[in-house]
């Protein structure tokens, strides 16, 4: 027999004028509220301007946060979503699932991006993440972010607690993370800095503390780097060494005429502990 589908009630209060856009949408336990200055055409123009400015800054190897911020719309978005609504069921048909979601975000050309994102029991491609939290905070000079991805002891796949944070600054990004196992032991702790250079993008390992990989603390050479050059070459000089002799090295021979000469050296490293 044919299957009968009964659509749920969707209550929507939406309008857009030249000076404002407003939306209230309720469907089951899905609730969305949006208020923005300017009509929808102006909001689309903001989006195009941001994309264009990002491309321009990447091409010119710099990050001008204030310039990017000037294109942000004056907007607030509030989203509360549970498990009993048509939008969650649409996600399920695509192989995703979610117990709940909460977003409280404000954007402004003066104050930047500020807000929080909370997701619970997200399932994507068969992988379950119990808790996801992201916080964004902007001041007059920069934008900071902190967050957490955690699987509790009842997770059927992996139990861990990953904490991360970072900062967008003038010429790049700093990102740091600590990953704890089910026994609250730090298995990985790493700080990475990405910076725009005149000839490419440079990554370096560093932070307030020495990196930890596979539960071992490593020292790292002071001027370490990996440079992804505009000419498609990779240059590197990273030396990680633990007290027990475990070491990881990545280095390049930039004097060769070969398209690429990159060497990875690993000594006494137990990959199963990472």
Task: Report the location of each language-model feature.
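Interface amphipathic segments
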Residues: 1-274
């Amino acid at each position: 027999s044919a299957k009968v589908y009964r659509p749920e009630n969707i209550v929507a209060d939406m309008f857009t004028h030249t000076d404002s856009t407003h939306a209230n949408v309720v469907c089951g336990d899905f609730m969305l509220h949006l208020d923005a200055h300017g009509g929808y055409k102006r909001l689309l123009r903001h989006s195009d301007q941001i994309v264009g400015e990002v491309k321009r800054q990447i091409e010119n190897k710099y990050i001008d946060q204030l310039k990017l911020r000037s294109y942000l719309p004056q907007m607030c978005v509030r989203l509360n979503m549970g498990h009993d609504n048509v939008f969650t069921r649409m996600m399920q048909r695509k192989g995703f699932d979610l117990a709940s979601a909460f977003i409280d975000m404000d954007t402004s050309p003066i104050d930047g991006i500020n807000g929080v994102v909370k997701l619970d029991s997200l399932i994507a491609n068969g992988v379950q993440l119990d808790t996801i939290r992201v916080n964004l905070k902007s001041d007059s000079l920069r934008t900071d972010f902190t967050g957490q991805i955690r699987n509790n002891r009842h997770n059927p796949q992996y139990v861990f607690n990953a904490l991360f944070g970072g900062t967008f600054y003038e010429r790049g990004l700093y990102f740091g993370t600590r990953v704890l196992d089910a026994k609250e032991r730090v298995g990985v702790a790493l700080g990475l800095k990405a910076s725009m250079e005149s000839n490419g993008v440079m990554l370096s390992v560093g932070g307030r503390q020495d990196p930890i990989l596979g539960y071992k603390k490593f020292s790292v050479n002071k001027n370490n780097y990996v440079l992804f050059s505009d000419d498609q070459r990779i240059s590197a000089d990273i030396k990680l060494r633990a007290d027990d002799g475990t070491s990881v090295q990545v280095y390049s021979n930039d004097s060769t005429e070969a398209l690429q000469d990159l060497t990875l050296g690993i000594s006494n490293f137990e990959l199963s502990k990472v």
